[in-house]
UniProtKB/Swiss-Prot annotation:
Coiled-coil zones: none
Iron-sulfur keyword on record: no
Lineage: Bacteria, Pseudomonadati, Pseudomonadota, Alphaproteobacteria, Rickettsiales
Alphabetic keyword roster: Ribonucleoprotein, Ribosomal protein, RNA-binding, rRNA-binding
An example Gene Ontology CC term for this record: cytosolic small ribosomal subunit
Signal peptide: none
Cited function: Binds together with bS18 to 16S ribosomal RNA.
Gene name in the database record: rpsF
Gene Ontology BP term (one): translation
Protein known as: Small ribosomal subunit protein bS6
Origin: domain of life: Bacteria
Species this chain originates from: Rickettsia typhi (strain ATCC VR-144 / Wilmington)
Record-stated family: Belongs to the bacterial ribosomal protein bS6 family.
GO molecular function: small ribosomal subunit rRNA binding; structural constituent of ribosome
Length: 121
C-alpha cells in the first residue's frame, strides 16, 4: 500500500448532500478494497482560476489515503465517469500529515465555516 493525496473539484451547482454521496462512493471503494482514509477535508466553494465549461466556481474536496495502485486507478476511473467532477488530481506522497492542510488553516483564520475534517491515524 502507498500514500496518495487526491483533490477533486465538483461543479458549483451540486448540493452538499450530493457531494456527500460522491465522497461516500469513493470511501466505499477504498474501504471495500482494504484501503484507509487518513484525512478528508472539504475546502468549500472556491473561485476557479479559469472557467471550466460553464463553471466559474467549484467545490474542492481533499482525500489523504493509503491504498494500492489498483484502487487508485479505480478511483480515477470513477472520477472520470462522474459528470459532477470537473477536475481531479491524485499524486503519490511519502507520508500524509496529521495537520490540517494549509488551505484549511487559511479558511479557519478567515472565519469561514469548516464543514468536514476527518483525520485518522
Amino acid at each position: 500500500m502507498s500514500f496518495y493525496e487526491s483533490v477533486f473539484i465538483i461543479r458549483q451547482d451540486v448540493s452538499l448532500n450530493d457531494i456527500d454521496k460522491i465522497v461516500d462512493d469513493f470511501t466505499k471503494i477504498i474501504k471495500d478494497n482494504d484501503g484507509t482514509i487518513i484525512k478528508k477535508e472539504y475546502w468549500g466553494l472556491r473561485t476557479l482560476a479559469y472557467k471550466i465549461g460553464n463553471n466559474k466556481k467549484g467545490h474542492y474536496y481533499f482525500l489523504g489515503i493509503d491504498i494500492t495502485s489498483n484502487i487508485k486507478e479505480e478511483l480515477e476511473r470513477k472520477m472520470k465517469l462522474n459528470e459532477s467532477i470537473i477536475r481531479f488530481l491524485t499524486i503519490k506522497v511519502d507520508s500524509i500529515s496529521s495537520e490540517p492542510s494549509p488551505i484549511l488553516k487559511n479558511q479557519s483564520t478567515e472565519n469561514t465555516p469548516v464543514i468536514d475534517v476527518t483525520i485518522n491515524n
